[in-house]
Amino acid sequence: MAIEGVLNEGFVTTTADKLINWTRTGSLWPMTFGLACCAVEMMHAGAARYDLDRFGVVFRPSPRQSDVMIVAGTLCNKMAPALRKVYDQMAEPRWVISMGSCANGGGYYHYSYSVVRGCDRIVPVDIYVPGCPPTAEALIYGVIQLQNKIKRTNTIARKG
């Protein structure tokens, strides 16, 4: 059955999970947690050339309005409690993108006494974007991968 037949009859069938996940992928509101030079590339991704708005990504200033956190840069031991506090203030469901080598595993500062060796020790990470610093294209690819992950989740029907 072609799409013309569906439109002529006036109805489309789908599951509630697919509908909910489709709406979630089209309205990702990230909380920016820019800690170092990776934040500049995150700003590039939000600017006119790459325009994350076309993916439904709108940066929000408050964690209570966000459902995605992008951790970009070196996470220090003093900043780790603040990262966890902001994560806890975000509404469910929430996702985390770790952007850059420093956020993924400490990066260049891996052996420093004051650096957390990966933000996944503080918050659960869904998508890792590698690079030092990763390009805006890499962040967009990470957002697309997060959208694909959200589409695969079961929100209502739990498979046993």
From Swiss-Prot:
Alphabetized GO MF terms: 4 iron, 4 sulfur cluster binding; iron ion binding; NADH dehydrogenase (ubiquinone) activity; NADH:ubiquinone reductase (non-electrogenic) activity; quinone binding
Classification via InterPro entries: NADH_UbQ_OxRdtase-like_20kDa, NADH_UQ_OxRdtase_20Kd_su
One cellular component (GO) term of this entry: plasma membrane
GO biological process: aerobic respiration; electron transport coupled proton transport
Keywords, ordered alphabetically: 4Fe-4S, Cell inner membrane, Cell membrane, Iron, Iron-sulfur, Membrane, Metal-binding, NAD, Quinone, Translocase, Transport, Ubiquinone
EC number per UniProt: 7.1.1.-
Named cofactor requirement(s): [4Fe-4S] cluster
Localization (cell): Cell inner membrane
Membrane topology, record value: Peripheral membrane protein
Main subcellular localisation: membrane
Residues bound to [4Fe-4S] cluster: 37-38, 102, 132
Protein name: NADH-quinone oxidoreductase subunit B
Originating species: Cupriavidus pinatubonensis (strain JMP 134 / LMG 1197) (Cupriavidus necator (strain JMP 134))
Gene: nuoB
